[in-house]
Curated annotation (Swiss-Prot):
BP GO terms, sorted: maturation of SSU-rRNA
Family: Belongs to the RbfA family.
GO cellular component, one term: cytosol
Family annotation (PROSITE patterns): RBFA
Annotated compartments: Cytoplasm
Pfam families named in the record: RBFA
Name the UniProt record assigns to this protein: Ribosome-binding factor A
Length: 134
């Protein structure tokens, strides 16, 4: 039976957990604010990790500043990660803003608006369909 997840996948999951804890407890820079680690992509040789993060900020400038702060602190974060994990080589890390949540919400709003507009064109009340389903 083949392994469902390779070593790189398992290490990436562990890195995600460790980085989340480090960002929560150790990184005190106010420019970072509330940050969530949404995913980690790790090369097969475990040398480089791309850390996808989301912020509870809406301003593009604040998000860019947060990513820059994280990338500037990546050496310190890497040292802390190396102490927490038992790896022969601790991967180089790079932080990237994860746009999937924002894009998903935007697409969801587009679909909702399109359905509502379609119902209004047909003369139906958008709330009427909700009542019919109950």
């Amino acid at each position: 039976m083949a392994k469902e997840f390779g070593r790189a996948d398992r290490v990436a999951q562990q890195i995600q957990r460790e980085i989340a804890v480090i960002l929560q407890r150790e990184v005190k820079d106010p420019r970072v604010g509330m940050v969530t680690v949404s995913d980690v992509e790790l090369t097969r040789d475990l040398q480089h990790a791309k850390i996808f993060v989301t912020f509870f900020l809406n301003e593009v400038d604040d998000i860019e500043a947060g990513v820059k702060v994280l990338n500037d602190a990546s050496g310190y974060i890497r040292i802390l990660m190396g102490k927490a994990m038992k790896l022969r080589v601790v991967p180089e890390i790079r932080f990237v803003y994860d746009k999937t949540l924002v894009e998903g919400m935007r697409i969801s709003n587009l679909v909702t608006n399109t359905v509502r507009d379609d119902q209004l064109r047909r003369g139906e009340s958008p709330d009427q369909n909700e009542e019919d389903r109950d």
